[in-house]
Amino acid sequence: GLDSSLIAALVNEYHKEHNLPQLETYSIGLEGASDLDYANEVAKYLGTKHTTVVLTEDDFLKAIPEVIASIESYDTTTVRASIGNWLIGKYISEHSEAKVIFNGDGSDELSGGYLYMKCAPDCIEFDRECRRLLTDIHTFDVLRSDKSISSHGLEPRTPFLDRAWVDYYLSIPHKYRYTGDSVIEKHLI
């Protein structure tokens, strides 16, 4: 999506500036998923070494017992949200020398990217909800992502949750961060 594409662009730029090897990017999904097409377009534009991992519903279902063991949770929402990270982590650990994975986690919480947040009555409540989600994020998204990826010997990185970036972004007056009924999600990002 938008979040991981932005991270890929920034990391790719860093690779080029420091003469590092070509950046490897990955996307995962079911056959025909539009996100896979978008990821391929971004990778082509950036010039990364891209791999699309196409899975079946059966692949996702078969992974559930191992995902539960890795994330140490039976919570349905947590398990469902972890399967993709777990499967892509497994694929990368088996097919690449990579040890660090950058992802877009935290962007929705920081920038109000969840659909329900468009219903906030005003920019003050919007800001309050973003801050509430960020306060608790280490107990759900970050922990879930870390466990599902690190279970394959990989190290996840979440640039959108970098303390300096979060502090900077939240210092922008909330009236500029809140779009209300706008169709443009995460317009500042």
Q: What label would you give each PLM region?
A:
Residues 2-189:
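ATP-dependent adenylate-handling active sites, centered on carboxylate activation for C-N bond formation
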